[in-house]
């Protein structure tokens, strides 16, 4: 039973993603086919996780774009309604954390109105990102994060002695 927990967990986490897919054939999909497609998409995501150095992990539907240029990487995110005090960008090791949260509670006409809007991204950075000069700006609902690139010298291969 324990060996199935990761697959079950992955299916639960992404069920909303599969349902919202624009290219999914809902008419001809059977429940078994839907589960098989979901598992297949997770295997692909796991493959990307281990084979790509840069990977977005997202928990919301904020539109984002990653641009590679000669001297920098640029992350552009559409975050309408957020101001700079509601967005946090943090660097921890080789991971860049981007989070936004809006909570508003209004009492009008004897009724409680509550709104909560949030997003969370974790980005694994390439080796050539200059972590000391990362910058971010928010203008007209567009968050732009600049990741300057530096030249990375390849280390000489080191032979490991087998005992």
UniProtKB/Swiss-Prot annotation:
This is Small heat shock protein C1. Residues 55-163 form the sHSP domain. The keyword Membrane does not apply. The keyword Cell division does not apply. Belongs to the small heat shock protein (HSP20) family. Keywords: Stress response. The gene is hspC1. InterPro entries: A-crystallin/Hsp20_dom (IPR002068), HSP20-like_chaperone (IPR008978), Small_HSP (IPR031107). Pfam families: HSP20.
